[in-house]
Amino acid sequence: MRPDGFREAPVTIVGGSGFIGSNLADSLLSDGMPVLVIDNLSRPGVEQNLAWLAQKHGNQPAVETADVRNADVLAPLVAHSRAIFHLAAQTAVTTSLVQPSEDFDINLRGTFNILEAARRSGKRIPVIFASTNKVYGGLPDVAVREEDDRCVPCDAGIRANGIDETCGLDFCTPYGCSKGAADQYVLDYAKSYDLPTAVLRMSCIYGPRQFGTEDQGWVAHFLLSALSGQPITIYGNGKQVRDILHVSDAVAAYRGALARIEDIRGKAFNLGGGPNNAVSLRMLLKEIGELTGRKLSILYDRERTGDQPFFVADTRKIEATLGWKAHVSWRDGIRDLADWLQHHRLEPEAARYVA
């Protein structure tokens, strides 16, 4: 038995009680891998996620309550990891504008603390970081035109394939800056310290265990509001387009990245549903209305700083490198999430779109 209580080195998921983290933990545990969850348990619903995991996997995973901002506590917890998935973050653009110092400390300082803990362990622990499409900024150079209920890129290549990783980084809002700088630190630690790191720049992930109180869980927000008869506020005209990816496909990508970590060391990949799962907010709301059989109450407000009229991930790089592809269509995925929320929902706050 190891000093930390594990018979073998665990896969550590920082932020493992959250939406993506708990689904990733479930996948790893189902394959018999030891898992350590590190989380500050600050979000509503995370206790339900941990209880679900413990019930399903016989009181696993191991859980340590800790904050990424506390380097002294964090370092010994991750020092014996087989690998680290870093999913913990302050996720709201709105919060970053009001509390930029907290956003900086969690997203950038917290990521730095994890990288340093991995580096100082002397064990070349892989670190796979959950980044965001917000590192590309508002994409002012991507010209779009409005067609019916959606924005469409004028460029035929982007229209067919989406935004690829050669798109210039353009950090916007404190959230975009903190996540973008963290993204670059993770990549640089592969160059400067030979640490096996990789970055997944995520589009909109949705699915079971996503509770509607999460600022960026806008797909779940919309569904919860429809199911509860709450109004939905759209910022802008609702023609903004995003590619949405079911969490089961996201988990497969994270696991694929770990399996090929030495091959992809120091690289970043866009991760999303791609062009086949691209929807405007209006399209999604129409689908939700038909799915739930409810008339939605939709309010409109002015668009927000840094909001992208169009972001669809070009996933050809991750598909070619990892042999990964999105399997769950967006309509099937929405039905799956709606069914799950019917049985597990928390009462939502007034729903807001923050993509």
Which residue stretches match the model-derived regions?
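N-terminal Rossmann-like NAD(P)+-binding domain of SDR-like oxidoreductases, especially those catalyzing
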Residues: 1-203, 344, 354
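Hydrophobic "lid"/C-terminal helical patch
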Residues: 24, 254-258, 288, 334-341
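Non-catalytic, hydrophobic alpha-helical segments
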Residues: 250, 254, 271, 281-284, ...
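Residue-level signal for the nucleotide or nucleotide-sugar donor/cofactor binding architecture
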Residues: 69, 98, 106-109, 166, ...
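Amphipathic terminal alpha-helices
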Residues: 1-4, 330-355
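Glycine/proline-rich active-site loop of Rossmann-fold NAD(P)-dependent oxidoreductases
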Residues: 180, 193-196, 205-221, 228-230, ...
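C-terminal "lid/loop" region of Rossmann-like NAD(P)-dependent oxidoreductases
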Residues: 237, 267-270, 282-285, 293-310, ...
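Conserved mid-core alpha-helix of short-chain dehydrogenase/reductase
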Residues: 73, 113-116, 244, 249-252, ...
